Amino acid sequence: MAFRLAVDCLGFENHPREAIDAVLEYWSYHQELEFILVGDEKTFDGLDYLPKNITKQLASSCIDMTDTPLTARRKVNNSMQKAINLVRDGAADVVISAGSSAVYASLTYDGFGKIHKDVKSAFMSYVPTANNDWFYFLDVGANKNFTGKELYFLGLMADIFVKKTTNKISPRIALLNIGTEIHKGFDYHQEGYQLLNEDKHLNFTGFIEPRFLLDGVCDILVADGYSGNLVLKSMEGTFKTIARLLKQGYKRNPLAGLFSLGILKRIAKRFDYKNNAGAVVIGLNKLALKTHGSADKQQFLSTIRLAHTSLKSDLINAIKSSLDNYEK
């Protein structure tokens, strides 16, 4: 099937060519895909030729990182809204943006609507672990506040995603907390724990502390968006610091670095967040993905790859079907 991907090329910290070059590279390996690049006239300066499956849509403004959902709505024909509208109107199957997280969460919610009345949308990212595996982490920043029931639905939707996109038939679900004891946390932690634990279709393993996350003890990590974003950014910062310290160590002792270089390169590549940059905006009636505001070509590539995987899994229809059964 020829999936159509709309890419907002404006509103992030780097040059739009980072997004465009990622699209061109990914398309070179998947020429059955169609891409719609959304930007202003300057975005496409010097871009004299595009393959027939890659088209341009012109916008007259972009969403800045300083914009709020309110100020964004005053920017007529902005690139983010235009890319979202392509999916809303059926001209594309998924939208990708590196723009403001708050604005993107708001505009996709307004444009696509919730997939279920009890669901709150979330950014779902994926994180490598020490045992050569991954876990999916949500919410990492779409919404600050969740009820226990909304946390339960995050676990339910992520369970569907993992079953559809991996070979895991019973993914382990954990709920982020400051301790593993049942009484720890706020009221919404207690309610979320109870609902996840009572659903016998889910493999819920209980609360988990942040220090155990990279040990590979869960496949899905559920959290409110405030806590989730703090933990994710802390991990990304830690990975960057370790990489910097290793480089400093090589300079001081090149011989020791030479003997360990192969192993350390593999570790650095695995935990480089640029290779794991995409987040699915889960809980909406249409498919949207978010990448970092500092995204470069590599981060856009990893986000496009995740978007393609999500499309092939027919994620939205799978979630809708499961939630319909929940009602029954």
Curated annotation (Swiss-Prot):
This is Phosphate acyltransferase. Catalyzes the reversible formation of acyl-phosphate (acyl-PO(4)) from acyl-[acyl-carrier-protein] (acyl-ACP). This enzyme utilizes acyl-ACP as fatty acyl donor, but not acyl-CoA. One of its GO terms (biological process) is phospholipid biosynthetic process. It catalyses: a fatty acyl-[ACP] + phosphate = an acyl phosphate + holo-[ACP]. Keywords: Cytoplasm, Lipid biosynthesis, Lipid metabolism, Phospholipid biosynthesis, Phospholipid metabolism, Transferase. One of its GO terms (molecular function) is phosphate:acyl-[acyl carrier protein] acyltransferase activity. It comes from the Bacteria. GO terms for cellular component: cytoplasm. Its EC number is 2.3.1.274. It is found in: Cytoplasm. Pathway: Lipid metabolism; phospholipid metabolism. The keyword Nucleotide-binding does not apply. Pfam families: FA_synthesis. Gene3D superfamilies: Isopropylmalate Dehydrogenase. Homodimer. Probably interacts with PlsY. The keyword NADP does not apply. Belongs to the PlsX family.
